[in-house]
Amino acid sequence: MTKQLLLSFLALSIGISQTVIGQEIDSTALKQLEFIKKVTYGMGHDLFKTRALPYKIKEDYVAPWEKLSNSNMENLAMGLDTIISNGSIAVEKGHFEEINVVFSSKVEGIENLDDIFTIALVAYTLFDVNKNPIRLKENARTNFGSISNSGIKNGQAFSYNYRTIKSAFEIESNKDTLGISGTVKLQASFPSGYDKVVITPKDIGKQFTIGLKKYEVLNVFNNIIILKPDSKNENLDRDFDIVNLNAKGDEIAQIAYFDLLKMNEGKEKPIEMIGVGTQTISEKIYKIFTENPTISKEEFDVIIDPIAKKIFSAEDIRAEREKQFGQTYIAITNAGPVENCYLYLEKRELKRAFEKEF
């Protein structure tokens, strides 16, 4: 009788899984196991090792919630109504000869429009001249511009400064757009606020909620933050964005690759580029590297191999894997030392759905 072995006991830490058929682990499976151990060790070693941190300070940084504070909610709500009433829809050819359904509009008095306005395709029913259905790509390419003028008309001074919006949805089927007919339903929105939390090196043990998910700050060291998700969280998806600020509110940002190359010129030991973002790490792997950040690959294998044997010999592979490797944590890697790391989540409660007809 064959038995499926899920070669994924490390999936909690690196997201790799492999199915192996048979009672015994064959040579191919062993090679895959060695590869998984190598990748997992490399990930843990890279996360916990002491290193120089190449980063830059962006003094002109303005946080998203500060940009939003420049426009009050009443003004934004009126702006949405204006965008919809001024809006029109047409078929246009793009820069790369693609054919697009384009929503165009204009509005005055909205600061940071480029940063805060979004538009989404809700639904559509479109046909060509022969009544064949037309399909659209769902993601819009939105460009912003401006139109301004001033002068005197009929003895009265006038002045206007419009921001323009052009959102293009590419037609991906039936490029014959002559006689296109139908309706497009869109949703335009502005953020209504931000759910945010700040994490500093002093916040180990801090519990917080962002969006609908709860976390605990398990550790903060160098440029790393380790979060322990609440077991009741729906999933491990990272819903929040991240920015690390110094005491002045400047961004501690990732250095550009070519700037790093210039920085490393003439150095015997070049500074490594650091990947900024989040990754998952299992409780067991975290514990191994916390207790011994400089553990060698050989020492790592001595710990992992007996665990692998227990998992492969268990009746319930998945349950044993979870038992051996424990909960999954989230590791946040910043470009520079953690000072004031903001996790923030945009709220888009200010939105309007509307239809345009061909």
What does each model-found stretch correspond to?
Residues 23-358:
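Alpha-helical, hydrophobic structural elements that either
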Residues 1-27:
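Bacterial Sec-dependent N-terminal signal peptides
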